From Swiss-Prot:
PROSITE patterns: ARSC. InterPro entries: Arsenate_reductase-like (IPR006660), Spx (IPR023731), Thioredoxin-like_sf (IPR036249), Tscrpt_reg_Spx/MgsR (IPR006504). Disulfide bonds join 10-13. This is Global transcriptional regulator Spx 1.
Length: 128
């Protein structure tokens, strides 16, 4: 099952939701503002990142700039606690399943969440 972590006001989040819905891909939606991610959720996501916290922290967010914190000097537990307290620190949307992770919306990359049969049929239809 696909988990879509988002905030409703985020344009990229709305695009990701619309894309998944239009391709009839089942997903569970998690509003990170009303249902903050647990530290276990965050740890699970971090295990799938290529660059660790760098991939999930939005250094351009207003919250990040207001906090003026150096994430490189935080322990992982301190960082997870901070993100749990301030979910707007996260880049969004976060889309994940058992094999894939995507941070942000990218129409080419989100295709990885399509079932293999769907992708195969789509490829065959472009060859004809």
């Amino acid at each position: 099952m696909i988990d879509l972590y988002l905030s409703p006001s985020c344009t990229s989040c709305r695009k990701a939701r619309a894309w998944l819905q239009s391709h009839k891909v089942p997903f569970v939606e998690h509003n990170i503002l009303t249902q903050p991610m647990t530290t276990n959720d965050l740890r699970h996501i971090l295990t799938k990142t290529e660059n660790g916290t760098e991939d999930i922290i939005s250094t351009r967010s207003k919250v990040f700039q207001k906090l003026a914190v150096d994430v490189d000097n935080l322990t992982i537990n301190e960082l997870l606690d901070l993100v749990t307290e301030f979910p707007n620190l996260l880049r969004r949307p976060i889309i994940t399943d058992s094999k894939h992770l995507q941070i942000g919306f990218n129409e080419d990359e989100i295709r990885a969440f399509l079932p293999r049969e769907y992708r195969r049929a789509e490829m065959l239809s472009t060859i004809d």
